[in-house]
Amino acid sequence: MERQIINRKKRVFSLEPNKNPSAVFTRKYTSHLVPALKKLNMNKNSSKQTVKHEVDMALALSAQEFAWSRFLLQKLSSSSNPTTTTSSSSDGIRILERPDKEGGNEEGGIEERLRELKKLLPGGEEMNVEEMLSEIGNYIKCLELQTIALKSIVQDST
Protein backbone atom coordinates (compact mmCIF):
# COMPACT_ATOMS: atom_id res chain seq x y z
CA MET A 1 0.00 0.00 0.00
CA GLU A 2 1.40 3.41 -0.92
CA ARG A 3 2.23 5.89 1.80
CA GLN A 4 -0.01 8.90 2.09
CA ILE A 5 -0.04 12.12 4.09
CA ILE A 6 -3.25 13.55 5.48
CA ASN A 7 -3.39 17.27 6.18
CA ARG A 8 -5.61 18.93 8.76
CA LYS A 9 -8.51 19.27 6.36
CA LYS A 10 -8.55 15.49 5.82
CA ARG A 11 -7.32 15.78 2.24
CA VAL A 12 -5.15 12.85 1.19
CA PHE A 13 -1.98 13.51 -0.84
CA SER A 14 0.21 10.89 -2.43
CA LEU A 15 3.89 10.95 -1.50
CA GLU A 16 4.70 9.51 -4.92
CA PRO A 17 5.04 12.50 -7.29
CA ASN A 18 3.95 10.45 -10.33
CA LYS A 19 0.57 9.83 -8.72
CA ASN A 20 -0.22 13.56 -8.52
CA PRO A 21 -1.15 14.84 -12.01
CA SER A 22 -0.56 18.47 -11.03
CA ALA A 23 2.95 17.71 -9.84
CA VAL A 24 3.69 15.70 -12.98
CA PHE A 25 2.51 18.53 -15.23
CA THR A 26 4.44 21.18 -13.29
CA ARG A 27 7.63 19.10 -13.34
CA LYS A 28 7.32 18.50 -17.10
CA TYR A 29 6.45 22.15 -17.73
CA THR A 30 9.42 23.56 -15.85
CA SER A 31 11.77 20.97 -17.35
CA HIS A 32 10.78 22.25 -20.82
CA LEU A 33 10.53 25.95 -20.02
CA VAL A 34 13.54 26.68 -17.80
CA PRO A 35 16.20 25.46 -20.28
CA ALA A 36 14.46 27.35 -23.11
CA LEU A 37 14.38 30.55 -21.04
CA LYS A 38 18.04 30.14 -20.07
CA LYS A 39 18.90 29.76 -23.74
CA LEU A 40 16.89 32.90 -24.57
CA ASN A 41 18.54 34.77 -21.71
CA MET A 42 21.91 34.21 -23.37
CA ASN A 43 20.54 35.97 -26.46
CA LYS A 44 19.86 39.53 -25.34
CA ASN A 45 17.81 40.24 -28.49
CA SER A 46 14.95 37.92 -27.51
CA SER A 47 11.57 39.49 -28.12
CA LYS A 48 8.37 39.13 -26.11
CA GLN A 49 6.99 37.06 -28.97
CA THR A 50 9.89 34.63 -28.74
CA VAL A 51 9.44 34.24 -24.98
CA LYS A 52 5.69 33.73 -25.47
CA HIS A 53 6.40 31.10 -28.11
CA GLU A 54 8.62 29.19 -25.66
CA VAL A 55 6.02 29.49 -22.87
CA ASP A 56 3.31 28.15 -25.20
CA MET A 57 5.61 25.41 -26.49
CA ALA A 58 6.39 24.26 -22.94
CA LEU A 59 2.64 24.13 -22.23
CA ALA A 60 2.01 22.03 -25.34
CA LEU A 61 4.91 19.66 -24.65
CA SER A 62 3.89 19.18 -21.02
CA ALA A 63 0.35 18.01 -21.75
CA GLN A 64 0.70 15.92 -24.90
CA GLU A 65 -1.96 13.46 -23.74
CA PHE A 66 -4.65 16.04 -24.52
CA ALA A 67 -5.98 16.83 -27.99
CA TRP A 68 -5.76 20.61 -27.44
CA SER A 69 -2.05 20.20 -26.70
CA ARG A 70 -1.42 18.39 -29.96
CA PHE A 71 -3.26 21.12 -31.88
CA LEU A 72 -1.26 23.82 -30.08
CA LEU A 73 2.01 21.97 -30.71
CA GLN A 74 1.15 21.63 -34.40
CA LYS A 75 0.34 25.33 -34.62
CA LEU A 76 3.57 26.34 -32.86
CA SER A 77 5.71 23.91 -34.86
CA SER A 78 4.28 25.02 -38.20
CA SER A 79 6.17 28.28 -37.85
CA SER A 80 9.94 28.04 -37.96
CA ASN A 81 10.24 31.64 -36.78
CA PRO A 82 8.62 32.22 -33.36
CA THR A 83 8.18 35.91 -34.05
CA THR A 84 5.76 35.13 -36.86
CA THR A 85 3.76 32.58 -34.90
CA THR A 86 0.18 33.56 -34.44
CA SER A 87 -0.79 34.20 -30.88
CA SER A 88 -2.28 31.49 -28.72
CA SER A 89 -6.00 31.08 -28.49
CA SER A 90 -6.15 32.99 -25.21
CA ASP A 91 -5.11 36.24 -26.91
CA GLY A 92 -7.81 38.47 -28.24
CA ILE A 93 -10.39 37.20 -25.80
CA ARG A 94 -13.45 39.34 -25.76
CA ILE A 95 -16.07 39.22 -23.09
CA LEU A 96 -19.56 38.71 -24.37
CA GLU A 97 -22.29 40.65 -22.65
CA ARG A 98 -25.40 38.71 -21.85
CA PRO A 99 -28.56 40.25 -23.20
CA ASP A 100 -31.07 40.92 -20.45
CA LYS A 101 -34.09 39.59 -22.20
CA GLU A 102 -36.64 37.36 -20.62
CA GLY A 103 -37.81 34.35 -22.54
CA GLY A 104 -35.28 34.95 -25.33
CA ASN A 105 -33.88 32.24 -27.55
CA GLU A 106 -31.84 30.38 -24.95
CA GLU A 107 -30.88 27.65 -27.42
CA GLY A 108 -29.26 30.20 -29.74
CA GLY A 109 -27.38 31.74 -26.82
CA ILE A 110 -25.96 28.37 -25.83
CA GLU A 111 -24.88 27.68 -29.40
CA GLU A 112 -23.15 31.07 -29.56
CA ARG A 113 -21.31 30.40 -26.29
CA LEU A 114 -20.21 26.98 -27.53
CA ARG A 115 -18.84 28.59 -30.71
CA GLU A 116 -16.90 31.08 -28.57
CA LEU A 117 -15.52 28.25 -26.41
CA LYS A 118 -14.44 26.37 -29.53
CA LYS A 119 -12.47 29.45 -30.61
CA LEU A 120 -10.69 29.66 -27.25
CA LEU A 121 -9.60 26.02 -27.11
CA PRO A 122 -6.71 25.10 -29.42
CA GLY A 123 -8.24 22.78 -32.01
CA GLY A 124 -11.68 23.31 -30.52
CA GLU A 125 -13.23 24.19 -33.86
CA GLU A 126 -12.35 20.70 -35.11
CA MET A 127 -13.87 18.90 -32.10
CA ASN A 128 -17.42 17.82 -31.45
CA VAL A 129 -19.17 19.37 -28.44
CA GLU A 130 -18.60 16.42 -26.08
CA GLU A 131 -14.88 16.24 -26.85
CA MET A 132 -14.52 20.01 -26.61
CA LEU A 133 -16.23 20.17 -23.21
CA SER A 134 -14.00 17.36 -21.93
CA GLU A 135 -10.85 19.03 -23.25
CA ILE A 136 -11.71 22.55 -22.02
CA GLY A 137 -11.62 21.46 -18.38
CA ASN A 138 -8.14 20.00 -18.84
CA TYR A 139 -7.01 23.09 -20.73
CA ILE A 140 -8.19 25.40 -17.95
CA LYS A 141 -6.46 23.28 -15.29
CA CYS A 142 -3.20 23.30 -17.28
CA LEU A 143 -3.44 27.09 -17.74
CA GLU A 144 -3.91 27.46 -13.97
CA LEU A 145 -0.88 25.25 -13.30
CA GLN A 146 1.11 27.18 -15.91
CA THR A 147 0.27 30.43 -14.12
CA ILE A 148 1.39 29.02 -10.78
CA ALA A 149 4.64 27.72 -12.29
CA LEU A 150 5.38 31.04 -14.02
CA LYS A 151 4.73 32.98 -10.81
CA SER A 152 7.06 30.64 -8.96
CA ILE A 153 9.79 31.09 -11.58
CA VAL A 154 9.45 34.88 -11.37
CA GLN A 155 9.60 34.83 -7.55
CA ASP A 156 12.66 32.58 -7.57
CA SER A 157 14.47 34.82 -10.03
CA THR A 158 13.88 38.05 -8.10
Swiss-Prot record:
InterPro entries with a match to the protein in the record: bHLH_AtIBH1-like, IBH1-like
GO biological process: regulation of DNA-templated transcription
Entry similarity comment: Belongs to the bHLH protein family.
Domain bHLH positions: 94-143
Protein name, UniProt field: Transcription factor bHLH146
GO molecular function: DNA binding; DNA-binding transcription factor activity
Keywords noted in UniProt: DNA-binding, Nucleus, Transcription, Transcription regulation
Biased composition (Basic and acidic residues): 94-110
Localization of this protein: Nucleus
GO cellular component: nucleus
Ranges annotated as biased composition (Low complexity): 77-90
Domain of life: Eukaryota
Region listing for Disordered, in residue ranges: 77-110
Species of provenance: Arabidopsis thaliana
